[in-house]
Design a protein with these regions (language model features):
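Nucleotidyltransferase catalytic core that binds NTPs
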Residues: 1-158
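Long, distal/terminal scaffolding or interaction modules
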Residues: 155-214
């Protein structure tokens, strides 16, 4: 069996992630692609406890919605459920043990290749799986977050809004909770809920109001 492993923060999940998944399934002739959201990335600043509690499971629901219709794909929550910093080696060891004889492929974005030497137990990891990188298109999660940060936009912690965003993703099968203003490929999964999301302070940076001006 050929199994692809696609880990990451997916914060936020977007069309680029789904595009990479589709390419990996085809290019590598995968029998299964396992999408693994991280609890906390070892290479990114961890959110404070309150933000982490608030955001983690909504992020998970969005990841599930984004990948739910992609054939041969499953979402694995072991890292989120384990909590703490997520190291790829811990997860790959487990999956290798659970699937003896399987050929494992670790799918990463092109921008992660340079940092591979810093991954925990990278030499063992390379023996357990084959790495395959893909360009980040049309955007990276980091670029999306930077756009909002540069415009002083923060995560909206209004639970009603987050719930509506999540419901929109599920009902519309959307891939991204936030469409970049200059990128029409990103559609808002919550267009149908605009009446519920009225916000006089909103400046048009985030179409679904998951982020807001402080």
């Amino acid at each position: 069996m050929r199994i692809g492993l696609y880990g990451g923060s997916f914060n936020p999940v977007h069309l680029g992630h789904v595009g990479i998944a589709k390419r990996a399934i085809a290019d590598l002739a995968l029998d299964k692609l396992v999408v693994i959201p991280a609890a906390v990335s070892p290479f990114k600043t961890a959110p404070d406890a309150e933000a982490r509690r608030f955001w983690t499971w909504d992020r998970v629901e969005m990841v599930k919605a984004a990948f739910r219709d992609l054939e041969k794909t499953v979402v694995d929550l072991r890292e989120v459920e384990r909590g703490g910093v997520s190291y790829a080696i811990d997860t790959v060891r487990q999956i290798a043990a659970e699937n003896p004889g399987a050929e494992l492929f670790f799918v990463i974005g092109e921008d992660s290749v340079e940092g591979l030497p810093r991954w925990k137990d990278i030499e063992e990891l390379k023996k357990l799986c084959t790495f395959k990188s893909y360009p980040r298109t049309p955007e990276s999660s980091t670029a999306i977050r930077k756009l909002f940060e540069d415009n002083s936009v923060v995560l909206n912690q209004d639970e009603k809004i987050v719930r509506v965003v999540r419901d929109g993703l599920v009902r519309r099968g959307g891939y991204c909770p936030c469409r970049l203003p200059k990128n029409p490929e990103f559609f808002c999964p919550c267009d149908e809920f605009k009446g519920q999301l009225a916000d006089k302070e909103f400046h048009g940076l985030c179409h679904c109001r998951l982020y807001r001006k402080p």
